[in-house]
Amino acid sequence: MECADYFIGSGRRCSPSTSTSTSREAWRPEKQWRKATNVIRGCHRLLRLGVLSAAAGIMRRNPSYVEIKVHDEGELDVSSGGDGEAPVAFTVAADDESFKGLVKNKREDCFRLLGGGAGVAAVLASGAERGIRGDDADVARRKKAFGSNTYPKPKPKGFFRHVWDALADVFLIVLLVCAAVSLAFGIKEHGIKDGWYDGVSIFLAVFLVAAVSAVSNHSQGKRFDKLARESENIMVSVVRAARRQEVSIFDVVVGDVVVLKIGDVVPADGVFLDGHALQVDESSMTGEPHPVEVDAVKSPFLASGVKVVDGYGKMVVTAVGTDTAWGEMMRTITRENTDPTPLQERLEGLTSSIGKVGIAVAVLVFAVLTARHFTGSTRDEQGNALFDKRNVTFNAVFSGLVGIFQQAVTIIVVAIPEGLPLAVTLTLAFSMKRMVRENALVRRLSACETMGSVTAICTDKTGTLTLNQMKVTEFWVGADRPRSAAAVNGGVVRLLCQGAGLNTTGSVYKPDNVSPPEITGSPTEKALLSWAVEELPMDADALKRKCKVVRVEAFNSDKKRSGVMLRDAATGAVTAHWKGAAEMVLARCTVYVGADGAARELGVEQRRKLEQVINDMAAASLRCIAFAYKQVVDGGDSDNAKIDDEGLTLLGFVGLKDPCRPEVKSAIEACTKAGIAVKMVTGDNVLTARAIAKECGIISGNDDDAAGVVIEGHEFRAMSEQEQLAIVDNIRVMARSLPLDKLVLVQRLKQKGHVVAVTGDGTNDAPALKEADVGLSMGVQGTEVAKESSDIVILNDNFDTVVTATRWGRCVYNNIQKFIQFQLTVNVAALVINFVSAVTTGRMPLTTVQLLWVNLIMDTMGALALATDTPTAGLMRRPPIGRAAPLISNAMWRNLAAQAAYQVAVLLALQYRGFGGAGAGERANGTMIFNAFVLCQVFNEFNAREIERRNVFAGVHRNRMFLGIVAVTVALQVVMVELLTKFAGTERLGWGQWGACVGIAAVSWPIGWAVKCIPVPERPFHEIITARRRRRRST
């Protein structure tokens, strides 16, 4: 695309249209006419350059255009922006592609022809101070012309794809083949009227299992997709109608003026408008790790997806969505993230081991049944041999083998606990959905599991332990504490207004003289600006007109201060202002001013008194901020000059109060009871940090005197690695810390065997968030870089939500253990019953359809029932579960063995002795065994709800899902036994037989209660056995 295309819009014409109204002719702004004239002159220049012919060719091929209309000022209800120009309306007659390649292809020549960033903004009916109009109609027109800021996502699996995946299981395929063979032989032997039952029954059973699995997977997939969309919906700061506001990244449109600060991710392609020391990390696009400085001359382009690492600025959006370089790359990505979580990987190993046992049993059963069948030992209900050795035919041999093979394969299907991965998916999906309701958005699935094993939490103070509702409660000018600003010299007040109102990333917007001002920015900036507006008082608009910002040094956690250089519009005098941590700023001051405006030398005694003022504020849990300034002699003309921060004049201090959250003390107590150490890592003064830690309950009066409990960052940095390892467990508070200190603290804790969770909100917290086992970013104050580096986003910035996430992490692990115990009980009982019965009687008590039904209720229904339990209070009264802890605990082995032994004993007794006397037939007896076995699993679901506690009914009334699944299972079992007799191979039972089945199943409750009275060692059984073997060998 030629440069002309950008100006005339790929054959589109820029046509200034004027109003014909004469009533407003007298006050039409001249700048609007000047803009229209500049557009026309630009077109004439392009004619002279000889490029219009190419543009005309494009115009003939594509006659659509963008039309910029300059309206009368009175026609718009938007006030003029600070750039002195009235907003212009943006009208689009057709699709436009003028700006799509400007940033993607880095067309600097076209950028210059358009007049730089301001020219691009003007063509897009926008401006640095006013932005776009931003009403619904304007946004809709821009979306229609340039598209929306969204990327195509890989199409999620449809329901039938899930069905297909479920049917792709090799053992289900074998069963389908066996069903087809059985159907063919059945029809051949018994005719189509009676011969289709067995084959079709197996077909239906297999498809039912696949359908239920598909429904579950499909619903969980949709839930995960919804959570993924929520995690991608970040808020972006834009200027619309001369007001700064937050909009969804999906609502950013071409022409929007985006405000960028440290930690932001650039939401779309755009060009630089204005700013100071703006640097971005383009490694996501180019792979280069070094920051790139962005300015209006050398590097004006900002690509979607890059991260701001320093400074701040504004950009005008030129392309969105798939028209950006990032969007083009995202369009090519179609692979879904299917990486298993650590728990899923461990469960796959367990499933594989159990599957091998099942296959071995199935092979033995096949061998035994084959031998008994072809020796004539297997007989039907009338006592006749199923295989007649005297009349051997191919059909008889093949049919017999298929039937036996079908039963053996069914044993494998039942034995392999395929419900374990489903249970993990279900409990993760359920937990993630509930966690979002409780303000914890999970970005990585593995974090859900890992939170259950956390032993140490390194948390920030501001906004996490405190309310983040800062307010100035103390004000000092030098060593004086005036009652109000009226008692302070006017020159000092003017300098304080400059320091508070212009050395800031916040903003003050006053829509009219009646409404209160709207203040935006970080909580600290908002508190300082509110104080300046209300107390000094400060006129933000007048201040911006009187002073021009020459240079800015943004605040970062290393310097703990920010600076700005201002030039007075009237006199040309240049002043440097600094604001930041009081002791840091005071250390660079040599002079201070009093309330009377007189400057005094800062001697040793006076410095000590001012330090005491700072300490008194800190001891009162106040954050102390100092203001200082310096007259710049050289005028700050050098482009690369740093703002001088030596020999400053102290203006004063303000103390900001940020109260602790009312619920944080109980949350920290809960962590202590749960065996989790809470460590506060803050950049605040050590006295402030200690006071807040005592208020929150992180340290007590006794702890305060212990060595290393409260430490400053520089002390920790000065230690050797061995010294750090020796003290790291004792640390409860680290004050005046740097992001590097937090990173090292996490590393040392992990070296000591801790599972570490870290909270963070700044860009510099990203390394610690990534290093931690679980990184938790703040959703309100956290930067986008911090959120991208984290595993969980705390949506309300509240420490109590961190504890909630820990509780849910433990619940995930606990629910999985419940299901493992339940399913292995079914697996063991089914394998032993079928194997023993096959060896001793030559037949299996449960048919293929019955076994598939058992597989359905234990794999899917059981997972649904047990994977949706909510956290209990008892979870936070036990120590964390180690990452290396076995999935099956000693208590689970105890419960499993007791229940499986009971089921095997009672069902084998039914198999051998029968029920109901001599009148009961073999089919009725098989139905009793099937019915009792299924009901045993239903009753055992209640036992599985609690692994340690004897009261298995605690809180069951609150779990409607569990009760619903139990009710549905019982209802379907009644249907299977009483109505689908042909399909299930059952016989209708009488009331007495049903009562007997329920009684047999109900005995599992007292057995479960009694067996939990038997103590088991904490140490895993396999470790005890291994240790004993080693001792025997050594002796």
Curated annotation (Swiss-Prot):
Upregulating conditions:
Induced by cold stress.
Q: Which residues are glycosylated?
A: 391
- For this protein, what reaction is catalysed? Ca(2+)(in) + ATP + H2O = Ca(2+)(out) + ADP + phosphate + H(+)
**Primary site of residence:** Golgi
Q: How is its activity regulated?
A: Activated by calmodulin.
Q: Which residues cross the membrane?
A: 167-187, 195-215, 349-369, 396-416, 819-839, 846-866, 888-910, 920-940, 961-981, 991-1011
Stored SUPFAM superfamilies? Calcium ATPase, transduction domain A (SSF81653), Calcium ATPase, transmembrane domain M (SSF81665), HAD-like (SSF56784), Metal cation-transporting ATPase, ATP-binding domain N (SSF81660)
- Recall the GO molecular function terms of this protein's record: ATP binding; ATP hydrolysis activity; calmodulin binding; metal ion binding; P-type calcium transporter activity
Tell me the residue ranges located in the Cytoplasmic compartment per UniProt.
1-166, 216-348, 417-818, 867-887, 941-960, 1012-1035
Keywords of the record, alphabetical order, are:
ATP-binding, Calcium, Calcium transport, Calmodulin-binding, Glycoprotein, Golgi apparatus, Ion transport, Magnesium, Membrane, Metal-binding, Nucleotide-binding, Stress response, Translocase, Transmembrane, Transmembrane helix, Transport
Record's bilayer topology term: Multi-pass membrane protein
Any one annotated GO CC term: Golgi membrane
**Family of this protein:** Belongs to the cation transport ATPase (P-type) (TC 3.A.3) family. Type IIB subfamily.
**What is the purpose of this protein?**
This magnesium-dependent enzyme catalyzes the hydrolysis of ATP coupled with the translocation of calcium from the cytosol out of the cell, into the endoplasmic reticulum, or into organelles. Involved in salt stress tolerance.
Question: What is the protein name stated in its UniProt record?
Answer: Calcium-transporting ATPase 7, plasma membrane-type
